[in-house]
Amino acid sequence: MVAKKTTVNEMGLSIDPLQQTEVSFKIIGTAPLIYNSMSLKAQKTLLMGAAKKTAAEKKEIKHNPEEEFVDSCYINGNNGSYLSFPSTGIKRGMATAALETAGVTKASINRGIYVVGEHINVWGKPYMNMSVVRSSDINRTPDIRTRAKLPNWCTEVTVRYINPTFSQLDITALLVNAGTLCGLGDWRIEKGGPMGGYRIVQTKDDQKIFDRLVKEEGATCQKLALENPEIEAHDNMSHELYEAITQERLKRAAIIKEVA
């Protein structure tokens, strides 16, 4: 057993510094990941307030699906990825999973572990998803939101934890449970949805899936997908909504041309 290092301060008190250990995990999604970043436009509105719309602006189509699709993403990736996700999503999931994991508490997870990096890299091709959502106002006003959806995705996380308060087995169990009980992104399992689930890469087949996504659905693929949005073939609602807004754009363009 390695002896603990003891620090003696000026008052003669001995303090045993906490020992930290890091462990890295490769993760693959078991359900699609839906992005939920707040757009820069929305952030500016919060900062400066919404300007009163002109008569011309009131006549504009309410939503711009292509713009909202891109704005929903976190674009801070590196090491071969373009997309990313806040690392706090992983930690929050682990803390929530602690409620269903014997021997640990949510408070101890919040204090004793740290997911390295502000963002984690995400590999996977984003598709445009349009769906009905409910606003958080008192009336739960319905609206259409366009977001990036990754049917297949993977990431890699490094967790730093206090040792011996936690063991590598504890961290592994928490991450496994977080992927099962919580997930990442919008409409995730924790919030009653079916999205965002994940598991740790543990088998050769899992490793093949991870390697393929990193190789084929990295930065180049992701940039092209954001520049040229596609909708999944089976996503009938998104196809119908996008067709409706496309026809409305053509109709308005024709009216403007006639007036000119």
Each model region followed by its residue ranges:
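RNA-interacting cores
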Residues: M1-A260
